Amino acid sequence: MKLQEIKDFVKELRGLSQEELAKKENELKKELFDLRFQAAAGQLEKTARLDEVKKQIARVKTVQSEMK
């Protein structure tokens, strides 16, 4: 992700409620699980996507803790 995309993603997250953030986190965790499964099977072409999803999950958790 480019810097502007990251800023837009975080801005979008800050506009969500706690429930929506939890839903977003679950979606990202499911995507991470699927990506890991593909990587283990040797089918994953864009391995950098694993790191992107992990960082997005961390961003969601950061915004959640900011809201508390």
Curated annotation (Swiss-Prot):
GO molecular function: structural constituent of ribosome
NCBIfam families tied to this protein: L29
Protein's GO biological process: translation
Entry-linked SUPFAM superfamilies: Ribosomal protein L29 (L29p)
UniProt protein name: Large ribosomal subunit protein uL29
Pfam families registered for this protein in UniProt: Ribosomal_L29
Swiss-Prot/TrEMBL keywords: Ribonucleoprotein, Ribosomal protein
Family matches, as PANTHER family: 60S RIBOSOMAL PROTEIN L35/50S RIBOSOMAL PROTEIN L29, LARGE RIBOSOMAL SUBUNIT PROTEIN UL29C
Keyword rRNA-binding attributed: no
Originating organism: Streptococcus pyogenes serotype M1
Record InterPro entries: Ribosomal_protein_uL29, Ribosomal_uL29, Ribosomal_uL29_CS, Ribosomal_uL29_sf
Sequence similarity: Belongs to the universal ribosomal protein uL29 family.
Keyword Chaperone recorded: no
GO cellular component labels: cytosolic large ribosomal subunit
